[in-house]
């Protein structure tokens, strides 16, 4: 089994999840919602072969965490995967759409370099 959308950093006990994934022979891509979470998640899954970690900046969090874009760029060279990026045009986040676009563009440019 492969799970391509798991926020391991949001589980209360991520270590137990890593053990279960390993024991059951599953594969998991842990998609982080912020660059800071990427660092912590990488530490939690160190040594677990079947779990990979994607560097992300969730569009829902861009308004409050856009200052982490510089950290995103710093970490990008060490990240094998990028995930949980994009745009959220829902009514709740519509006012942040211009900022989301700017941050997404910065991420895409950084990924292309």
List each model region and its residues.
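Mid-domain alpha/beta scaffold segments of enzyme catalytic cores
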Residues: 1-113
């Amino acid at each position: 089994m492969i799970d391509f959308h798991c926020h391991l950093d949001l589980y209360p006990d991520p270590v137990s999840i890593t053990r279960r994934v390993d024991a059951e022979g599953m594969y998991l891509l842990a998609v982080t919602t912020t660059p800071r979470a990427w660092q912590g998640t990488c530490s939690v899954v160190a040594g677990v072969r079947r779990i990979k970690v994607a560097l992300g900046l969730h569009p829902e969090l861009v308004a409050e965490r856009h200052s982490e874009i510089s950290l995103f760029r710093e970490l990008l060279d060490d990240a094998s995967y990028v995930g949980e990026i994009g745009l959220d045009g829902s009514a709740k986040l519509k006012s942040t759409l211009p900022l989301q676009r700017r941050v997404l563009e910065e991420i895409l440019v950084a990924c292309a370099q």
